[in-house]
Each structure stands twice: as structure tokens, then as C-alpha cells.
Amino acid sequence: MTVKNETVDYSKTLYLPQTNFPMRAGLPQKELELMERWEKRGLYAQLRQQAKDRPLYTLHDGPPYANGHIHIGHALNKVLKDVIIRSFQMRGFNANYVPGWDCHGLPIEWKIEEKYRAQGKNKDDVPLNEFRQECRQFAQHWITVQSEEFKRLGVVGDFNRPYTTMAFHAEARIASELMKFALSDQIYRGSKPVMWSVVERTALAEAEIEYHDHESDVIWVKFPVLQADSKDLYDAYVVIWTTTPWTIPANRAVSYSSQISYSIYEVKSAENDFGPQVGEKLLFADALVMSCAEKAKLVLKRLRVISAKEFKTLVLSHPLKGLAGGYNNKIAMLDGSHVTESAGTGFVHTAPSHGREDFEIWNAYKPLLEQSGIDSSIPFPVDDAGFYTKDAPGFGPDRKGGAIRVIDDNGKMGDANKEVINALIKADRLFARGRLKHSYPHSWRSKKPIIFRNTPQWFISMDKDLGDGSTLRSRALKAISMTRFVPSSGQNRLASMIADRPDWVLSRQRAWGVPICIFANEDGVILKDERVNERILRAFEAEGADAWFAEGARERFLGERAHESWIQVVDILDVWFDSGASHSFVLEDRDDLNWPADVYFEGSDQHRGWFQSSLLESCGTRACSPYKAVITHGFTLDENGKKMSKSLGNTVVPQEIIKTFGADIFRLWVMTTDYWEDQRLGKQILQTNVDSYRKLRNAIRWMLGTLAHDEGEEISYCALPDLEKLILHRLSELDQLVNRAYDDFDFKKIMRALLDFSITELSAFYFDIRKDSLYCDPPSSKKRKASLQVVREIFERMVIWLAPMLPFTMEEAWLERYPESTSVHLEQFRPVPMEWQNESLAERWKKIRQVRKVVTGALELERADKRIGSSLEAAPIVFISNPVLREALENLDMAEICITSALTITQGVPPSDAFILSDVEGVGVYPRKALGTKCARSWRYTQDVGSDPTYPDVSARDAAALRELQVLGKI
């Protein structure tokens, strides 16, 4: 029987973990305390001072609009950028983050107009610069709000000196960049069909468009043949199909494809109230004739094939010919590559006033059309407010009752479709009609449908020779080929957009923004006068772009040329030009940033937005890209993969996540996503991240508690036990992985590796094995000191590696360990000694862990069957027939590795009742209860408990530890 020592409380003789680092993080409150500490200690200024002599690393911030609280997309974007900035700052670079805001444009202007409408005010009654001042104040308010929201996410940056596109200097530089385009003849005035918002009375860029389902009228229309080489075509009709009946008055041609098979068909029977009658001859693509016949309830007979050659000489009449004395123009047949057999009739209604492809094919054939005596001019059938003009006879101001409207001020469809359809029925030119639900472009701000309309605008040419044999398009495509893209698919995506895009529509008919500050004559010729430009730029620098709209601005800027017939352009610049020019007034103007930027990082929608406008602006003025790399992230969906929407009630608000869980939980979610794809977020997903966070935090907490007993002793590498060398080898591997992944912006790879390492290799393996030695060994134990040294290395390296990702938690942990330190964020990633890399040792331990896995499996079964409580109650026999595994275990205390009180290794084939695992050949375990007595201090079962009479209830090892502690006065 073991005698119990009643005089010693053994729990107080153990080196148990001691720390004030709580298990429950309380992040929402703790993060605020850390932010206050950073602010008081001037952490941002210290980061800049520390890095002032290092090489620069520049991430240029794509500016969000200053018009509301941040949403989940903003939060995702800023966290990803913050991780990049912090990771380069901690790896030897001067990485300064300068946040920016896009302040001009329709979103902000729309908000002020909404306020006016609520007050019963009319925007047109307010002086322009007074309105602009309200827009400026609105933007400044939201810059302040968003700054605090970004900082609450843990984002570190120069929030006291951000860039804004409405700053006077920025407006001056934007104007200067515009002048460079003007002076190099890249800007011209022209008329083209542009996307037009009737509700907002302005042209829109592709990036300002979103697509929603919309139900439209669809019609099939008969165009009578006017001229043909073949007599049997003279009384025939070419049938087109369109989803925009209101554009029929603007028709100038019908397009076909020489690659499609067409025939002439005769109507044999008809069951309809209007449309084709028996005996009529109609032209269709053969692949589409059946669907067309069914729609019009016809039985058709194929007469013959129509050759592509016949179409070249075919001329049609307008289906509304004679209406209100108009539409007497000849309708040409044009061979177009955009014509397909996917829907319709195989013939495409072509209205160059209302479609990009229509416009392009019309211009391509312009010389031939004029040779044929066809008027090639393009009409303006619809005005700014969506009303028909005089170019649409019978529907415009000549109509009794006034002009008909296509879309009204509320974005509702007007009577245009109905009136055009009625006119076609009256003219016996309607083949069939219907309704179609399809994806249709809407303004991203008003959410209302837009139209394509021909309107005079200012453009930047994509294909003008720039004097060196290049064009803006070719320069941009070359720059793309020299740019790194993450993911790599972004390169082809941006290149295809640049290759296919039309000229850049610069002008907007709005009030809030940088004006197109040029003077031009009636023919659109731009004044090129350096003195005039200099006066404009000086005024903008001192007063902002409001100077352009001040009374007497024309005379002020033209000076001695004011008597000449130059017209002041009052259109506003496309806001994408503003942000696209930001590289000029941010990267080029600040000493702490580089031009070109190392990286631009935004959502994948910015291939058609900021990435593109920045590229074109820079290539047009500097012949190269303003960035070396482009990274994109996807969009955040709900847990079911649906787009977040207020109407669906499935939005996740970043402020609520922070309030409930803390910013580091949100950041952890970001770090565990494939951010370059669309991600999912919701309560269950967040809870999964909370669970992962707790495991990581507990590992850090255990290390902090253990290191409370660390006296900083260093043991040479060669004197370390093999297990410690293995962990150092793993740290060397992780160091390579972490650095490479930070370079590759693969944050998920880092987080997954470090989570797996902390849970699988540390908590469940290394820490578990070494707890006995760390808690129970004598103070002089080299094994214990070696383990403390390695735990110290693990802690410092892991906390520093994770600091860019989880800045609050890692700061809290670092300050718990080093309370006199200023911040973990002032630390640098540490180099790894070459001697830590030990592949042969790692290979040996793979084999050791295979055997351990079988032992652990056997003990888990024993525990489940309640034959043992703790693994220390076991002393299993391990049978090993595999000589390679047996060799790996030589000179190794497997009982310590398997956390048993004893363990016997036997050579030979395992008995039939031994525990085995199918994936570990040649190993079997026979469970056996440990012999001896349970040590009251370590709880191990040994034969030497009671060998020391002073401590009769502990093992010899523990008795020696107690005597040593007694000598040191610790008990």
C-alpha cells in the first residue's frame, strides 16, 4: 500500500500553465481597447518611421463611393488589402496603405436630388455650385463614417491623409490628365448610340449598368422587297424579330449572315387576326422558320433557297413607309457576323441610332451605302427625356397630341411600343407579336431600365494612331500581357474586354464631378492653348473644379481669346476617368508610394471598371500600365449561395458581425475562403470559424501559460531531443509555406496550414507528449528546457505569421507574453536557421507516427469500452513485423510518445486478436493494463513509486524533482 504524503500539495509543485490570456476572447470589447492603445501610442506613425529606409511596396486602393455605410463587400476587400499591407510590412518592406474615396458622380448626386424632392425643391432652381457644395459635404460626411468602419475592421493606414477624387489637387490632376488626351488628339466629339438613363438624364458607362429580368414586347415585322435581281422576290417580304418595337422608326437596314441558309416560303394557310395572308411570300432562315410559322399560326411551303449573292442586291422598303409623309428611305441588306440562328428569324432589324452592333455595321458599310444612293446619316429619333423627335414622323412632335414617350421619368415604359405596333398593324406589316422575359440593362443607381440612343458625346478613341504605330487599344493589350493576374483567368477576361470595347464615352450630362474642361468650336475642334490650360489648372488647384462653373469662367480662362467663337463644354467627366486617373495624383505625388503600383486588388466586377479605366488612362498618357499585378475577389453570397438582397432579408452586415463576434472572427472567415471565387457567409459558417478560432486561441493560451515558466535558456540545436528537432523542421517548412503563400496572396493556404499545425501537430501531438516533461520534470531537466525553447519558437513565429491576418488576437497574445513591447506589428518575420531543415529526421518521424496511430487507435477502443480511463493506465504490447518501422523506433521511448506508462515492442506478426489498422501494415497492438503504482504527482504508473521515503507516493523521477524544487526554495 502506498503511503500518502500529507504535507505537500503536489499540484503546487507542477509547472502548470499560468496566464491571464482568457479562454473566452471577448473580442468586441478587447478589440476596442487595443485600438485605443494603438492610437495612444501612435502605432501607425511608428510603423512608418520604422520602415522609412526600406524598399517600398505599394497597393493602390480602389476608391469606394462615399455614400453610405460599408457593406460586406467593402469589408472583405479592405481586410484582404490590410493583410497584404501588413504581411509586406512585416517582411522587410515599407508598405503604406493610403485609403481613397470616389466622391463624384451619380450616386452622390442622386442622394442630394432625393433630399430636394423630399423638401419639394427643384434641383434646377438651385445654383449649380451650391448644389455641388452639398454633394461635397455629403461625400465628406460618409468619408468620416466609412473611415471609422474600416478602422474597426483592424485596417491600418493613413486615414488622416487619405486621397479623395474631390480634393482640389485631385480635381486639378484629373483635369490635367484629360488635357493630355486632348492635346494628343485622342478626344473627339461624335454621335454614337450610348446607354442612356432617361430617369437620370445622362449617358452611362458599362460599369454603371446591372442586368435584371424585364418583360418586353416582341414583334415580327415584314419588310417589303423594293429592289431585287430575281423577279420572284419583288412581292416578297423579309421578316425580322425585335424586342424593342419602339426602335422600328429608326430602322435603316436589315442584317443577314452569309453563313446561314435562307429560303423563300409561301403562306398556304393562315389562322390569325392580323399578319400574313395566304399567298404571301416570306424570307426566313431555314433553321428558324418552324418556330416563326407556329407563332403566326401559318402553314408554309418552301419555294427555293436564297443565295447570299441575291441579298447583296436586295433593297427593302421601310415597314412604316408613308406614315406622316416619312420613312421613304431605302432599307439596305447588310452581311453581319453578329447575325445568328439562335433566335428570331435569321434577319436582324438594324437601327444604328439604338445599338452598338447596328452602329458598327452601318458605319462599316457607309461608303457602299452612299455609292448605292442610300442616305448614310444616322438620325436622332429619341431625345434626352425619352420622347420621339422629328426624326420619328408620326410619333414625334408632329403627332396630334404631342410626342410619344419611350420611357418616363419614373422608369416606366411609355406608349411607344403600343403606338408603333398599332401603326405596323395598320400598315399590314406586323407578322406576329408576343411577350418575352429576358435580362435587360438597368441603371445601377435608379434600378430603372435604360435605352440605347444616338446622342452627341465626347469620346476617347481606342483605335487612333498615337504617332508611334500604336493605339490605345494595342497599348492596353500589350500592358495586360506584361501584368500578373491572380487568378490568372483575369488576364484573358480583361484582354477580351479591351479587345472588344467601343470608344470610351467620357461625357455625362450631370452636375457633380470634374468637368470636361475644354473649349471647342461648333465642329468639335478642341482648343489647344497651353496658356488657357495653365489658367484652368491653377484655378482648379486653388478653388477646385467649381471654378469652371463660376460666373465669368469662360472669359477668365480664355483670356485674350475670349472674343473668339470657342464654346465652353459643360459636360461632366465619367467618374471612371476620375478614379482611373488616381494613380497620377496618389502614386506619383506621394514619396511613400511607388508608381507603378505593385498591386491593384478589387472585386472581379472591376475588370470592366477601375482596372480598365486605370489601364486606359495610363496607357493613353504614359503608354504603360499603372500596376504590376491585378488581384480580384468574388462576391459574397448567403449560406445557400444566393445573392444577398435586402428584399430577401439575407444580407449580412459587417457591423453586426463585429458587434457579436469581433473583427478577428470576420477576418478569420475571409482568410479561410477561396476569395477569388464567390464566397458564402451566414450564421452557421461564422460559427464554424468561431470554433476554429477557439482551438487556435486555446493553443496560444496553452503556450502562454507554459512559457510563464520559461527563463529564456538556450540549448544548442545539436543537443536538442529528436522530437524538438522535428518540430523545428516543421517550423522551417511552415516558414517557407507562409512566405511563399503571402507572396502568392494565398491566405487560405496559410491559415489552413497554421490551423492544422496548431490542432493536429501541436495540441494533439507535440504538446500532448511534452506535457509530462514540461509539468513534472525537475527544473534542471534538459528535456524540459529544450521543450520550453521550442514552445517559445513556436509561439513567436506563429503569432508573427498570424499577425497580419488576426491583428487583434495576436497583439493581445504578444502583449501578454511581452508586456513591455509596443506591438507585435512592429516585429519582422524571423529567418529560419538552415540546420532546422532535417528531411531524414522528418521521414523517420512519419514512420514513428504511423505506429503511434495504431497504438492510439487501440487505446481509444479501450477507453470507449471503459477498460481504461486515461492512456497512462495502459502498457500496451506493440507487435511489429515491418523491419522499416521497427528500425525507426530504435532508441526511442515509445511509452512517452504514446503517453502510456509503459510500452513493449515485440518483433513478429501480431496475434489474431491484436488491434490493427488497415492502412498501417505490419503493426498490431495488444492492450494491457499498466503495472505498478500510480504516481500522485504525474499520475503515471511506475514500479518505483515509494522508492523515496520522503515522498512515498510519487515516482523516483518526481521525487527528484521535488527535492530540487525544495533546494531552490520553491516548495
UniProtKB/Swiss-Prot annotation:
A motif ('KMSKS' region) lies at residues 643-647. ATP binds at K646. IleRS has two distinct active sites: one for aminoacylation and one for editing. The misactivated valine is translocated from the active site to the editing site, which sterically excludes the correctly activated isoleucine. The single editing site contains two valyl binding pockets, one specific for each substrate (Val-AMP or Val-tRNA(Ile)). L-isoleucyl-5'-AMP binds at E602. The keyword Protein biosynthesis applies. Monomer. It comes from the Bacteria. GO terms for biological process: isoleucyl-tRNA aminoacylation. It is found in: Cytoplasm. Catalyzes the attachment of isoleucine to tRNA(Ile). As IleRS can inadvertently accommodate and process structurally similar amino acids such as valine, to avoid such errors it has two additional distinct tRNA(Ile)-dependent editing activities. One activity is designated as 'pretransfer' editing and involves the hydrolysis of activated Val-AMP. The other activity is designated 'posttransfer' editing and involves deacylation of mischarged Val-tRNA(Ile). This is Isoleucine--tRNA ligase. Keywords: Aminoacyl-tRNA synthetase, ATP-binding, Cytoplasm, Ligase, Nucleotide-binding, Protein biosynthesis. Transmembrane segments: none annotated. Its EC number is 6.1.1.5. Signal peptide: none annotated. The keyword ATP-binding applies. Its main location: cytoplasm. Belongs to the class-I aminoacyl-tRNA synthetase family. IleS type 1 subfamily. GO terms for cellular component: cytosol. It catalyses: tRNA(Ile) + L-isoleucine + ATP = L-isoleucyl-tRNA(Ile) + AMP + diphosphate.
